């Protein structure tokens, strides 16, 4: 089967079925451009990520997981901005036209696309080392997009879920001798390969007036620093309040903390909001009306002393400053 037949069989036909149900997509695959209709009062949110074999996923990762995760992590960016998914494009580079790979890749891709009712509206394929580039488009009300730069003094810092499990999965993939007989490896691999974009948070992030947010892709500390840098603030983090993944529970305490603080690939949301709005969210959670969130610290004014030290985060245990060393080395792209 030739390239165009493969694309039609595994991508075009499925995307056109979804497009018929997606009001924002005026024209999908089949012309020189897609046409997207954004409702009056909304703005378009756009994000792009590229995934390279050997850099962002292991060579033995199954193609279903590659397709699934490639879209999931882009959807996570939309969730962090408070945007609802509309459409996406796919640029796929393959070393050869392996139909088995393409079939499983597309099945993983559309498994999550269908879950969130997002349409594939265009893209490209070419020959070369395996890579996947996805651009997602979403919509959010004008003036309500949630940015990194909005954190305010005394905001509560929250995360949407447990941290560190996916990073442990990466470590196990590098050292496979630790997989055999490990009761936590399956949990860790599932968290690594099949992240859950937190679209369920979006309406609540608007309802409770979240001031700043981003998704945790490169490690909690490294990503929190983006909020602090953009907002010109500092933070206090209570170590005992960091939610640890169940996949870590058999590891020493220091290792658990390191994976949770620095590991990355969690794709939970880190966000800040006022104390008043945090308490309202918690009240609704207790009555079953809102998702669970975890309070991990607070935003502080950036003092000259912290600027000179180049350190925007202070750790506390039971409210007292921590004197012992805590690793702060999150993932770096270069």
Named regions from a protein language model:
Residues 2-18, 42, 95-119, 126-130, ...:
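Glycine-/charge-enriched secondary-structure boundary and capping motifs
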Residues 61-65, 187-195, 211-212, 257-259:
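Short pre-catalytic strand/loop immediately N-terminal to key active-site residues, enriched for Gly-Thr
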Residues 1-62, 81, 90, 334:
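Extreme N-terminal cap/leader segments of soluble proteins
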Residues 63-87, 104-115, 222-227:
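Small-aliphatic-rich amphipathic alpha-helix that forms the alpha element of a beta-alpha
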Residues 176-196, 247:
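A short, charged helix-loop
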Residues 10, 51, 84-174, 298:
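Glycine-rich anion-binding loops of enzyme active sites
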Residues 157, 161, 194-220:
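Internal active-site segments that recognize and position negatively charged phosphoryl groups
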Residues 35, 74, 82, 120, ...:
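Residue-level signal for inorganic ion chemistry
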